[in-house]
């Protein structure tokens, strides 16, 4: 699989050969869906919670006597059928959202996404993304001249200048190959990758 190499103006200047095992796989939609949803599920913090009828702060006084009023019997205001009462089957923070995906499947899904992006022309290669100083304006200007607004940058090594320049850009995500995840690849759509990072991906996937 040949990948397009571009310069600072977004113009194609060369091509680089990449492994078909990593960048030339067929797109497996079911596998990609599985690894993306598993990644999202595993990222959940599990911080949702509701209160049971035992945990709701309410009076334990019986609202009215059991018989003779003509109304339905009622024991206490924390009943789940009352407004402001507890929840019958509440969510709790200790729920386990983990989805297990085998390492081989995860890497195959990652390779399928990279391959599809390469076929669609959304994965481009650059020699390097060196930034002279930690200035957001410098990186934003360079990406704009290359024709990118929203992009995921995969660099073989992230120096302080690149990291500091990118962290205030909401539509720019900078990672090293081992940090790349399927959800971000799908979300950002456009990927800039350095030549050295390609080799790291091939060894990893």
UniProtKB/Swiss-Prot annotation:
GO cellular component, one term: ribonucleoprotein complex
NCBIfam families linked to this entry: rplD_bact
Protein name: Large ribosomal subunit protein uL4
Family annotation (SUPFAM superfamilies): Ribosomal protein L4
Summary of subunit composition and partner proteins: Part of the 50S ribosomal subunit.
Source organism: Thiobacillus denitrificans (strain ATCC 25259 / T1)
Stretches with biased composition (Basic residues): 62-74
Pfam families in the record: Ribosomal_L4 (PF00573)
């Amino acid at each position: 699989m040949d990948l397009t190499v571009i310069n600072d103006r977004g113009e194609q200047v060369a091509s680089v050969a990449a492994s078909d095992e990593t960048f030339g796989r067929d797109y497996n939609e079911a596998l990609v869906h599985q690894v993306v949803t598993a990644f999202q599920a595993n990222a959940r913090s599990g911080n949702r919670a509701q209160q049971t009828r035992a945990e709701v702060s309410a009076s334990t006084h019986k609202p009215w006597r059991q018989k003779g009023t003509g109304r339905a019997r009622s024991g206490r205001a924390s009943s789940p059928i009352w407004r402001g009462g507890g929840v019958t089957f509440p969510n709790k923070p200790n729920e386990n959202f983990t989805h297990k995906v085998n390492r081989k499947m995860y890497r195959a899904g990652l390779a399928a996404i990279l391959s599809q992006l390469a076929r669609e022309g959304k994965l481009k290669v650059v020699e390097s993304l060196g930034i002279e100083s930690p200035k957001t304006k410098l990186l934003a200007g360079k990406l704009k001249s290359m024709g990118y607004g929203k992009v995921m940058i995969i660099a073989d090594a992230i120096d302080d200048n690149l990291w500091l320049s990118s962290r205030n850009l909401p539509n720019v995500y900078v990672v090293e190959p081992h940090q790349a995840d399927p959800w971000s690849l799908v979300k950002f759509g456009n990927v800039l990758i350095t030549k050295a990072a390609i080799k790291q991906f091939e060894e990893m996937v």
